[in-house]
From Swiss-Prot:
It comes from the Bacteria. Binds 1 Fe(2+) ion per subunit. InterPro entries: ATPase_NBD, Gcp-like_dom, KAE1/TsaD, TsaD. Keywords: Acyltransferase, Cytoplasm, Iron, Metal-binding, Transferase, tRNA processing. It catalyses: L-threonylcarbamoyladenylate + adenosine(37) in tRNA = N(6)-L-threonylcarbamoyladenosine(37) in tRNA + AMP + H(+). Required for the formation of a threonylcarbamoyl group on adenosine at position 37 (t(6)A37) in tRNAs that read codons beginning with adenine. Is involved in the transfer of the threonylcarbamoyl moiety of threonylcarbamoyl-AMP (TC-AMP) to the N6 group of A37, together with TsaE and TsaB. TsaD likely plays a direct catalytic role in this reaction. Its cofactor is Fe(2+). Coiled coil: none annotated. This is tRNA N6-adenosine threonylcarbamoyltransferase. GO terms for cellular component: cytoplasm. NCBIfam families: gcp_kae1, T6A_TsaD_YgjD. The gene is tsaD.
Length: 338
């Protein structure tokens, strides 16, 4: 089955064509980073307007790159939530229009399930069940995954997501946006062991990054923001390491607690080079099979949405054209919508 995926949950407008849920034929992403960087974060109104401008060209480019016509598409999958409602509605409206005009089946997809499913576009794929860490700007969750649509939430952030912890640190230090990318790049020049930031490593599988953020703020108030690039690199390297340590250790702990020797790491923050490196180191030590999509499939994209869509469409699932966007949508109850 050839599926067109559409994603517009935040600040990337994306479209992709995927065959049989495994073969990526095209993957087009229009980023809005340049539009939002001056504000230090995503402005919902601007995001919605930019999606309107980009969505049709992006879909046409995805079809062109795949060597396809719209008549070749057999089903449409679109992100339904969670996300910014104004942004979601752009992709959802276009998907509905295409489905209606071409008489194609349509399925609305949970954004986080898409992130988890991105791994099935890799050469090496896990078998069910597995543990999944979904780590992004808005989410930091650990799931027990028994199959498509079958998720049990094991742990989540109690305050900021890991991506927010990166972005807020970058804003505090005035080093640019998006914070995770800037910190990842700069941290490579620093020594992560020169400073020691706190790790919230309680018995629970839940996360908390508020104490880490406060610790950085106290450090800056006491010592000032580093003026020398070398000192700044040491600071962000140590801060990044504190985030990475917690993400890795709690995820591997979840795998051991549930006797599941397979871990999938996904979401935008999964493109962080130190996180990938440390997960590889620790998973080898713990004899756990690690699966991480390539960076281009970690950030928001429509290919991952098409993968989930293909699975649902092959089961005969489809949505009414009356479906609406869902701004808040727990993944472990997503199946109740189907």
């Amino acid at each position: 089955m050839i599926v067109l995926g559409i994603e517009s949950s935040c600040d990337e407008t994306a479209a992709a064509v995927v065959r049989d849920g495994r073969v990526l034929l095209s993957n087009v992403i229009a980023s809005q980073i340049g539009e939002h960087s001056k504000y230090g974060g995503v402005v919902p109104e601007i995001a919605s307007r930019k999606h309107i401008e980009a969505v049709i060209p992006v879909i046409l480019q995805a079809l062109h790159d795949a060597g396809m016509e719209l008549s070749d598409i057999e089903g449409i999958a679109v992100t339904r939530g969670p996300g910014l409602v104004g942004s979601l509605l752009v992709g959802l409206s276009v998907a509905k229009a295409l489905a209606f005009s071409r008489k194609l089946p349509l399925v609305g997809i949970h954004h986080l399930e898409g992130h988890i499913a991105a791994i099935f576009l890799s050469e090496k794929v896990p078998e069910f069940p597995f543990i999944a860490l979904v780590v992004s700007g808005g989410h930091t969750n650990i799931y027990f995954v028994r199959g498509f649509g079958l998720f049990t939430l094991l742990g989540q952030t109690r305050d900021d997501a890991a991506g927010e912890a990166f972005d807020k640190a970058a804003k505090l230090l005035n080093i640019g946006y998006p914070g995770g990318v800037v910190i990842d790049r700069l941290a490579k020049e620093g020594d992560r062991n020169l400073l020691n930031f706190p790790r919230a490593m309680k018995e629970s599988l839940d996360f908390s990054f508020s104490g880490l953020k406060t610790s950085l703020l106290v450090h800056v108030k006491k010592h000032g923001s580093p003026s020398a690039r070398e000192d700044l690199a040491h600071l962000v390297a140590a801060y990044q390491e504190a985030i990475v340590d917690v993400l890795v250790e709690k995820t591997l702990k979840a795998a051991k607690m549930n006797s599941v020797p397979q871990v999938v790491v996904c979401g935008g923050v999964a493109s962080n080079s130190r996180l990938r490196e440390h997960f590889m180191e620790r998973s080898r030590e713990e004899n756990i099979d690690l699966f991480i999509p390539p960076p281009v499939l970690c950030t928001d994209n429509a290919a991952m949405i098409a993968v989930v869509g293909e699975n649902l469409l092959n089961k005969g699932k489809s949505e009414e054209l009356s479906i609406n966007a869902v701004s808040r949508w727990p993944l472990d109850v997503a199946g109740s919508f189907r």
